[in-house]
Regions:
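N-terminal helix-turn-helix
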Residues: 31-63
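Hydrophobic aliphatic residue packing
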Residues: 9, 13, 21, 35, ...
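Short, cationic-aromatic polyanion-contact patches
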Residues: 10, 34, 68-85
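Extreme N-terminal segment that seeds HTH/winged-HTH DNA-binding domains in transcriptional regulators
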Residues: 1-31, 37, 85, 89, ...
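Beta-hairpin "wing" of winged helix-turn-helix
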Residues: 25-26, 30, 58-67, 71-74
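Short Asp/Glu-rich motifs
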Residues: 40, 75-76, 117-118
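A general secondary-structure boundary signal
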Residues: 10, 46, 59-61, 69-71, ...
C-alpha cells in the first residue's frame, strides 16, 4: 500500500480495512490479523497497528475476545453505516471538484450515465 503524506497512516489503514469489509474481502465475524501481523502486512509500526485496532474498536467495527484475537463485527447495521459514510465522503469530494469545473449537478449526472455506458466499471 502506498501512503498519502497528507493523511495520517493509521487513518489510511483504517480506511483500507473498512473498504475490505464493505467489499466482503474481509467477512463479518472474521478474525483479523494480530497487531504484529497487521504491522507487517501494511509495513507500519506495531504501535500504529495497535492504534488502528483501538480506533476500529471504538467505532464498533471490530471487537476483541481476550486471548482469542480481534474480530470484525457481525452487526450489518454498522457495516451499512460504514458503506454510507464512505460513499458520502466520495460524493462530497466529487461534488466539490465538479463545482470547481463549473459543471452543474444535472450535467454531472449525465456525464456519469454516459461514462457508465461506455466503461465497464465492474472491474
Amino acid at each position: 500500500m502506498q501512503y498519502d503524506s497528507k493523511l495520517p497512516i493509521y487513518l489510511q489503514v483504517i480506511n483500507s480495512i473498512k473498504m475490505d469489509i464493505i467489499n466482503n474481502r474481509i467477512a463479518c465475524g472474521q478474525k483479523l490479523p494480530s497487531s504484529r501481523e497487521l504491522a507487517v502486512q501494511y509495513t507500519i509500526n506495531p504501535n500504529t497497528a495497535a492504534r488502528v485496532y483501538q480506533e476500529l474498536e471504538r467505532e464498533g467495527v471490530c471487537f476483541t475476545k481476550r486471548g482469542m484475537g480481534t474480530f470484525v463485527t457481525e452487526d450489518e447495521t454498522i457495516i451499512r453505516a460504514i458503506r454510507s459514510e464512505m460513499a458520502d465522503e466520495a460524493i462530497v469530494v466529487f461534488l466539490k471538484r465538479i463545482k470547481e469545473l463549473g459543471i452543474s449537478v444535472d450535467e454531472a449526472v449525465e456525464f456519469i450515465r454516459h461514462k457508465e455506458e461506455e466503461t465497464d466499471v465492474s472491474k
